[in-house]
Amino acid sequence: MHAILNTFKSGVGDCVFMRLIKDDATFSIMIDCGKYTPEINLFIKEKLHKHIDLLIVTHIDDDHINGVCEMLIAMPEITIGKIFYNCYQLLSGEKIAALTKIVSSDIEILTQNLPKQRTDTNGKINMEHASVLASILLKNPQWNSAWEKTFYIENSLEPYPLGDGLGQLVFISPTSSELKTLDMNFAREYLRLTRHEVINAPFE
């Protein structure tokens, strides 16, 4: 087996692809995307054939999440095997409920105003894009099914086996304290922009 690592300029954020190749099989991993560029779009179409085996969105800072939203909006036909997304989450560890109709309406407006391309990004928490990404994943049956909603990435996790002799993922960041800070910031921004409290109930 051998691995091919591809990185792309994505504003001040990250966009990393790893392809694990064993015999005739290829396993593709995408990690974050601050800006969905034409180069990334072409890579996904020509090298990955519009399929990602594992999409990892490490946290909801703008420079990690914006391009993922843009990718899914621009390429709704893309298939994804599994999704790890450190979505907004309560400190108790309970996940946020599926969006109410009222909140969904607010987020639809945010989605419509999401730019197709960003020329820069400030690297700060972005409530709009965090909500939009969750909404996009929940509405698409294939992506919704692929989203591991109980899996929350932090550096204290045990290594995650990929199976089929492909090795394992070792998580070295983010820390739980960093995620708690993001969670609190998100809850504050969510209330400010949607006028609704973050819902304390499991995902549907």
Predicted regions and their residues:
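A short acidic (Asp/Glu
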Residues: F17-M18, I65-E70, E94-A97
